[in-house]
Amino acid sequence: METKREWTTIKEYEEILFDFYNGIARITINRERYRNAFTPTTTTEMSDALYICRERPDINVVVLTGAGDTAFCAGGDMHVKGHGCYIDKDGVARLNVLDVQKQIRSIPKPVIA
């Protein structure tokens, strides 16, 4: 017998979905149209969500996923890439994906992708 999970939103973001169910935090890259390729906004939002996961004692495990069934994540979005770097909405060169990778590795909870 399969039961329907009632996920609740932890926080609203522009490019990710961040929700919770029974000790599980789920972070979904929500850019299906671009095969969930990340932008500076995506990595900033993921970093914030991972910080919340680290700090909340009711979160026991983190699941990272991508929207749709085509791709988990295609990497960096080439549409926002400038000359040699990724450009955010403010025109500043940044992507910070290594910071997010460090957070994933150092969070004291299991992370499943």
Model-assigned labels for residue ranges:
Residues 13, 56, 75, 107-108:
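Acidic-histidine catalytic/liganding microenvironments
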Residues 100-113:
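Conserved catalytic cysteine-centered active-site region
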